[in-house]
Swiss-Prot record:
Belongs to the UPF0434 family. InterPro entries: Trm112-like. Pfam families: Trm112p. HAMAP family: UPF0434. Gene3D superfamilies: 2.20.25.10. This is UPF0434 protein Ping_0902. One of its GO terms (cellular component) is cytosol.
Amino acid sequence: MLDIKLLDIIACPLCKGKLSYKKNSNELICKFDHLAYPVIDGIPALLKVKARTISSDEE
C-alpha cells in the first residue's frame, strides 16, 4: 500500500503531471499520458518500462 502523502511530492516522470492513486490495482495513474505505474511493496516504480498503457475507461 502506498503512503498517500507521497502524492503531494511525486509526479509523472514523463510529463511532470499530477498522479492519482488507484487503490484496487495498486497503481499510480497519469491521466495525461494514459499510463499506470505499479506500486511494489509500497514503493512507486516510476519508470516508463514498468508502466502500462491504460484506456480512458480505466482512468
